[in-house]
């Protein structure tokens, strides 16, 4: 029992009656003898313990609690620290539809740094070299005709994990399968007019930047926001 007045209320119930009163007048719920609470509590023992005093589980728990908490995943840490470059190209349909600013804005909001930008009419030879891995495909001639049908905007972007992140921002090749929120998912409806190109690997990022930009056309600069994007 717990309470400020529990002792005063308990005592008259459980003490022996005065000598002049007979046993019939005793409270039927109490014994005439005084109750020794310390003895009663000492007699109580828990039926089980989660860990014995020196069990292996207890020692492991103590060791883990004293160690610094944290998870170290070196492969994730390494990927998070790699500053990469990727090539992004707004295709002729993206320019005709006035989407250049929208596309640049999405990459800037993500925190990537623009280090190269130019607009020009793509010659056929350059388009064929860029898409040479697709030269055996039946749609290759139409692809080259499409890319050379109007000016393109060439961009080089820099950032931590920029290649994979840019691919996610762009969305799947088929706009109808691209997730809402991606460039293609929001702004395109057909594979043949999917607005933008992005490098599919860090190696291709370097190759494509070297293909579309001449020496001296890239601008290396320090962003004032860098400390707010990375620790």
From Swiss-Prot:
GO terms for biological process: auxin-activated signaling pathway; CTP biosynthetic process; GTP biosynthetic process; red, far-red light phototransduction; response to hydrogen peroxide; response to UV; UTP biosynthetic process. Keywords: ATP-binding, Chloroplast, Kinase, Magnesium, Metal-binding, Nucleotide metabolism, Nucleotide-binding, Phosphoprotein, Plastid, Transferase, Transit peptide. ATP binds at residues 91, 139, 167, 173, 184, 194. Induction: By hydrogen peroxide. Pfam families: NDK. InterPro entries: NDK-like_dom, NDK-like_dom_sf, Nucleoside_diP_kinase, Nucleoside_diP_kinase_AS. The keyword Phosphoprotein applies. GO terms for molecular function: ATP binding; metal ion binding; nucleoside diphosphate kinase activity. One of its GO terms (cellular component) is chloroplast stroma. It is an enzyme of class 2 (transferase). Residues 1-62 form a transit peptide. Its EC number is 2.7.4.6. Belongs to the NDK family. Major role in the synthesis of nucleoside triphosphates other than ATP. The ATP gamma phosphate is transferred to the NDP beta phosphate via a ping-pong mechanism, using a phosphorylated active-site intermediate. May activate MPK3 and MPK6. May be involved in the regulation of cellular redox state and hydrogen peroxide-mediated MAP kinase signaling. This is Nucleoside diphosphate kinase II, chloroplastic. The lineage of its organism: Eukaryota, Viridiplantae, Streptophyta, Embryophyta, Tracheophyta. The gene is NDPK2.
